[in-house]
Regions:
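Hydrophobic membrane-insertion alpha-helices, especially the h-region
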Residues: 14-28
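Non-catalytic, solvent-exposed segments at the cell envelope interface
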Residues: 2, 27-353
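N-terminal Lys/Arg-rich, disordered targeting/topogenic segments
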Residues: 1-12
Length: 353
């Protein structure tokens, strides 16, 4: 990924990967519409006899970490099949730059399942002394930065130490460090990364006519700094793009009596998974496949990905088509953790081995 420029066509193909995780099978229609040279390469590879999932797995390389990044911090159980293809979806906070959303979309072509794993952003990362020493050299006052041990700040630390000198598999110290932390702590290898801003969610939801969902409680919150205003009533309703963004971002506000209410990161992750499930169940159908084509150009500026060429895109297309054809099973996994106070900062502590 890094800083290299991508052509508009490649960006469109990258977007296919995001939508393949949500709307499996769309690529089959896409290849019949776009007709420039890179897409012909995409088509040629898509219909080659190679297995897309096997090709993606063959691109895997060892993490080659300089040392253990954590103090033997390991989640207590396995989250995915070792042969699953795992795409990390990143959604940033538009004001702070921290990662507001970290979601793993795990595609298991052998067991025909798509698993969504939302990683709570407040998870405490128990960094190793080796890493802390390197961090102190690069950033002497890092310890004074509040919440720096949260997983949603991992990319900041990766950038500070110039992790792997920008020569890791994603060619980006922020993404490489975050991916290696996830692999070390959760034993989930990240095959590719998709960086998507909240504004993209608005456009996708509006284009498909909204998402019907049962909102569990009043969501009312206002933050002028983030240009964020959430006002969603409790109950079954269809959310447009703006409210859909508010639904997945909501974490605190006021209740029906005007009193302060906080649902915490774990509850917010449950809402996000519920939203994704609702979107898939309502819009994963043949009649909606054609809609994807017309929104590519409008969304590509909001999305970046480690999948940057037609051949890689078509490998995901094969996986998506296979899962869709076999009527895949959709699952979700909640990360088990508990609230803790560490030096006056709120964190979530993982259940460990």
């Amino acid at each position: 990924m890094g800083k290299r420029k991508k052509s508009n066509t490649n960006r469109l193909l990258v977007l296919v990967i995001v939508l393949a995780a949500v709307l499996a099978g769309v690529i089959c229609l896409y290849i019949n519409v776009v007709k420039d040279d890179p897409v012909f390469q995409f088509v040629k590879h898509l219909f080659s006899p190679d297995n897309g999932a096997d090709t993606i797995r063959s691109r895997r390389t060892a993490s080659d970490k300089p040392y253990d990044l954590t103090d033997n911090q390991r989640y207590y159980k396995e989250l995915v099949n070792k042969n699953s293809i795992n795409v990390l979806i990143i959604g940033p906070d538009e004001t702070s730059g921290s990662y507001d959303t970290l979601m793993i979309v795990s595609l298991d072509d052998r067991n025909n399942t798509v698993k969504l794993i939302n990683i709570p952003r407040d998870i405490y990362i128990d960094y190793s002394n080796e890493f802390k020493n390197d961090l102190k050299k690069a950033w002497p006052k890092y310890a004074s930065s509040k919440g720096i041990y949260k997983i949603n700040a991992s990319h900041v630390l990766g950038k500070r130490v110039d992790y792997k000198n920008g020569e890791g598999r994603f060619k980006n110290p922020e993404y490489d460090f975050t991916a290696d932390i996830i692999e070390e702590v959760f034993n989930v290898y990240i095959d590719d990364i998709v960086f998507i801003k909240p504004s993209s969610l608005r456009k996708i939801v509006d284009y498909f006519g909204g998402v019907e969902i049962d909102v569990p409680y009043l969501m009312k919150y206002s933050d002028p700094v983030q240009n964020l205003k959430i006002d969603i009533k409790k109950g079954l309703q269809t959310l447009g793009g703006k409210d859909a963004e508010g639904f997945v971002r909501y974490r605190q506000g006021v209740d029906e009596k005007g009193k302060y209410k906080s649902i915490g990161d774990i509850e917010r992750k449950k809402n996000q998974v519920a939203f994704v499930k609702a979107f898939i169940s309502q819009h994963l159908n043949i009649k909606n496949l054609g809609k994807i084509i017309t929104i590519f150009n409008d969304l590509n500026s909001y999305i970046d990905s480690s999948v940057s060429n037609p051949e890689q895109a078509s490998d995901y297309g094969k996986v998506a088509e296979k899962l869709y054809r076999n009527k895949f099973i959709q699952e979700s996994e909640e990360i088990e953790c508990k609230s803790v106070d560490i030096e006056g900062i709120y964190y979530l502590e993982l259940r460990r081995n």
